[in-house]
From Swiss-Prot:
Subcellular location: Plastid, Chloroplast thylakoid membrane
Stored PROSITE patterns: CYTOCHROME_B559
Disulfide-bonded cysteines: none
GO biological process, one term: photosynthetic electron transport chain
Similarity field: Belongs to the PsbE/PsbF family.
GO cellular component: chloroplast thylakoid membrane; photosystem II reaction center
Single GO MF annotation: heme binding
Transmembrane segments: 21-35
Subunit field text: Heterodimer of an alpha subunit and a beta subunit. PSII is composed of 1 copy each of membrane proteins PsbA, PsbB, PsbC, PsbD, PsbE, PsbF, PsbH, PsbI, PsbJ, PsbK, PsbL, PsbM, PsbT, PsbX, PsbY, PsbZ, Psb30/Ycf12, at least 3 peripheral proteins of the oxygen-evolving complex and a large number of cofactors. It forms dimeric complexes.
Co-factor binding comment: With its partner (PsbF) binds heme. PSII binds additional chlorophylls, carotenoids and specific lipids.
Protein name: Cytochrome b559 subunit alpha
Predominant location: plastid
Cofactors, names only: heme b
Length: 83
């Protein structure tokens, strides 16, 4: 026998005016905040990822591929020194 948890049924929640008043403001706000976060470049600064024009420098146009198993730290230092 199943019991009642005391929660409102989902159908009651999504058909209420209060739900749509709250979510008609929050959902577009979250979308706009995310768009601004990415379009202003703040996402690149926060997560430390390179911007699209910083993947390749003028002096290094090849892919920074680490090929050595035992000298990987030296190769990594060489790649970061070129930045």
């Amino acid at each position: 026998m199943s019991g009642n948890t005391g929660e409102r049924p989902f159908a009651d929640i999504i058909t209420s005016i209060r739900y749509w008043v709250i979510h008609s403001i929050t959902i577009p706000s979250l979308f706009i905040a995310g768009w601004l976060f990415v379009s202003t470049g703040l996402a690149y600064d926060v997560f430390g990822s390179p911007r699209p024009n910083e993947y390749f420098t003028e002096s290094r146009q090849e892919i920074p591929l680490i090929t050595g198993r035992f000298n990987s730290l030296e190769q990594l230092d060489e790649f970061t020194r070129a930045l």
